[in-house]
Amino acid sequence: MNIRAAGLLDLARIEEMHRSADIRLSEAAPPAARLWSLLSSTLSALLPLTQETLMYVAEDNGKVVGFIQASGQPLGLDLRRARVLQVLNLQVADGSDSDEVAFALVEHLSNQALERGALRLFVRLPDRDPLLPAFRLRGFRQYATEVVVYADKPAMRSDQFPDGLRPARRGDNRMLYQLYRKVTPQGVSQLEAPTYREWRALHGGEWTGRLAARGSDKLEHVVDRIELVGWVKVERSSGARPDTLNFLALPEGPLPGELADFGLSLLGDSEGPAWSSLRHYDSHMIDALRGRGFSVLLTQLLLVKELAARVPVQEKGLVPSYG
């Protein structure tokens, strides 16, 4: 079996494999879960080659039997500058040895990413995904769980909103980063955004890897009590996708529930469904939304592989001078 970079002549075969996997997923998953996968960087989110991606194919006896695709993080980043890559797709053709092909593709991508100077590879997979062993055996480890909650008709429980609410301002960014560090376990923040600069690069995707919504009306507020203790961003959809709610909140008293109610109030007279992507450590927000008509749509595993260890710059000491 030969692993090589994908070329234009491979596109028809790649699209055929992707459609086949697409059909299987559509038959197995609820429509809303399928839509989430299409709009996020969940494994199976094929990006066109016009975007900045790495794509490699596995070839056996002259026939393409699998492919893998990765992009810079955030999506669209020039790959020459990317130090973090997101695996977007891994497909193996029907009838091929899934373990052998997937393992070889993941190994090749890891080696190529390291040669390009990447520090880490991320991937998100639905739980119980059959391709999970291919990543685990190549050194990927789970660092978080993503929970997507969904409601056909979300309902507020109260019009009592948090004290200190105000619209977000450009100058809030550093305080928002401090809030992110407070609510995120250190093991996660050190992987995803160990510095303010890296957090800013990921902020557009709200730390979920979700593709930016088009044709949506966005509203963003913070809860300011000298320090920021809460943040909510609402994207009211003008198309077929559900409205989107994003949250950060300290797990203090009534704050999660009040922030959830305020977020729902920003949807106005929308009668469509809504969803929100949260992490396992956001259990206070998950519980608050469950009490307002939401239920778990799907659970995804977030995995990472460290390609190169970061070595802190050694501090210069004072050396006595003689003579």
Predicted segments with their positions:
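A short beta-loop-alpha structural element at the N-terminal edge
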Residues: N2-L25, D163-Q190
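Active-site rim helix/loop that mediates acceptor-substrate recognition in acyltransferases
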Residues: A28-M55, L191-D217
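Conserved beta-strand in the GNAT
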Residues: M55-V57, K63-G72, I226-R236
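A conserved beta-turn-beta hairpin within the catalytic core of GNAT-like acetyltransferases
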Residues: Q73-V87, R236-N246, L297-L298
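A short, internal acetyl-CoA/4′-phosphopantetheine-binding micro-motif in the GNAT/acyltransferase core
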Residues: L85-E100, T244-P256
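Conserved acetyl-CoA-binding loop-helix of GNAT-fold acetyltransferases
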Residues: D97-N111, L137, G253-L267
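Conserved GNAT acetyl-CoA-binding A-motif
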Residues: A113-P126, D269-H280
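Active-site/acyl-donor-binding loops of N-acyltransferases
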Residues: R138-S158, E271-G323
